[in-house]
């Protein structure tokens, strides 16, 4: 009698193991099912702040349209159109600068500084550097040409192509506290002190 009970128990255990192996081999789920993975869309604050320019290309040559007219250069001196997207949350104004770190001055060369651009702006049209098409309420600082407004590339003849950094700043203040005759360096100091994010495109020019 005892032997029969043991035999039946062993037979039952073997059958159970065989059934489990068959179920696993057939690809059936034997554990607790996992919930489906959710696709998370990044918030605006997680997206990257970007700048683009229809007439400029990254590491590409700047057209004569945007080159300085003077000092031996014969361009049209029209500031390029700029566009930006995904500014960070809390942006209260924007600023735009154009700077050549390769100029043989020891401190580079400021070609353009525009600030107090309203927070609802998404870019600047071509020619905004003259002030005519600039956003209402914006201001421009003195460049290293000794005047306000855009001054295009004009590197020394024979230099390797210079790098021109067109940069947009997203700022945490709606207006910069600088005097009307502030230099580009002074404005740049205040931009870096109040920036939330920056984006830039670098283009080249040589002659």
Label the predicted regions.
Residues 2-11:
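Bacterial N-terminal signal peptides that target proteins for export
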Residues 2-3, 17-18, 75, 105:
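Generic secretory/membrane-interface signal
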Residues 11-20:
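Bacterial N-terminal signal peptides
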Residues 25-207:
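N-terminus-centered regions that define maturation/targeting leaders and the start
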